[in-house]
Amino acid sequence: MPIMSAQWQEDSKANKQRWFLGHQDAIDFVNCFFDAVELWDDLIDKDVEVLDEHVNRAFLSLMFVLPANRWFVANYNYYQPLIMASINGFHDANEMSKSDKKHLRNLAFHIRNFGIEIHIATAFLIGGFEHMRKVSREIREFYAFEEFENA
């Protein structure tokens, strides 16, 4: 994943406040979880230098912070299938991205973003169906900013 600008980081923070209706435990869950996801991606695709600080932060988060997060604990059964589907999609995408077939590389480009569904599911759990529908397209557009040709 490319290094995101300070402006993008600020926009992300403001967006999460809106998307998740200021629910801090849910925001903390999403931030903690996706910090580890980004590390995993960087370790596999080796497109950026991985700092020891990021490794230490992600492992601390996965072993201590995430299991102690009240939002995650309360919604664990809802998230687990989404997390597993995201992990499976990540592995499939990494394999298909190496294909000599363009349609498989294109598919890989799209399924690697399945984790976005965790953001959308969080919006649903917090605000219900109408709230999810209100923010889901914006969430997709915010995170899916790369084009296939550049992937």
What are these model-derived regions, one by one?
Residues 1-151:
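All-alpha prenyltransferase/terpene-synthase fold signal
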